[in-house]
Regions:
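Short active-site-proximal "capping" loops at secondary-structure junctions
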Residues: 20-25, 49
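Secondary-structure junction/capping motif
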Residues: 1-8, 24, 64, 102, ...
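Alpha-helical cap/lid subdomain in secreted, periplasmic
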Residues: 30-188
Length: 188
């Protein structure tokens, strides 16, 4: 992904990949420590692995719809707590930052796909609320990776999806007025 981003950035701009496969929200401190000194902006795409950790709950049964919603609310509240703590660490770096939503899964099982897509807004709402409350831009990966060919497997973008994400990041970095502290959603 970072190689794709480097190909679409203006001459002289650099990009570093701090993400680690399998990393979760609580791992952000270690990732931020790896940031090069010359870092000028942060683009945060985190939380998908945390959400995947809750995938088994989609197979649980409930005695009522209210019971199921309360279980999902409990999971969402935990996610929100961790996400806010993570984001405080990011903002502590005093660099302009953007947040990415979590893209929708592409599970081969139709029922799991429907359940996953229905549950994902609980988590993306946390991300967008944090961004909007702090006047930050959002890169909406749900709208960017919107075709089957954008996915290499059920949970990761393909090269084509990566190209689309890289283009959206480059567009956001070139166009967004971070000093205005006004949120804007980027979808390409």
């Amino acid at each position: 992904m970072v190689r794709q981003l480097r190909t679409v950035l203006p001459p002289g701009w650099k990009a570093a990949l701090l993400a680690v496969d399998g990393a979760r929200i609580g791992d952000i401190a270690g990732q931020l420590r790896q940031a090069p000194r010359e870092t000028t902006h942060l683009v945060i795409s985190i939380g998908g692995n945390d959400v995947l950790g809750h995938l088994p709950v989609l197979h649980d049964t409930a005695n009522s719809i209210a019971g199921a919603l309360l279980r999902l609310a409990e999971i969402r509240e935990g996610f929100a707590h961790e996400y806010r703590a993570m984001f405080d660490q990011v903002l502590g770096r005093r660099l302009p930052a953007a947040l990415c939503t979590i893209y929708e899964p592409h599970f081969p099982d139709a029922q799991l796909q429907r359940a996953g897509v229905a549950a994902l807004p609980l988590f993306n709402d946390v991300i967008t609320r944090e961004a909007f409350a702090r006047g930050l831009p959002v890169i909406d990966l749900r709208l960017i990776c919107d075709r089957d060919e954008d996915y290499a497997n059920p949970i990761e973008p393909s090269a084509k999806g990566g190209d689309k994400i890289a283009a959206a990041i480059a567009h956001m970095l070139a166009e967004h007025a971070f000093v205005a502290e006004r949120s804007r959603v980027f979808v390409r």
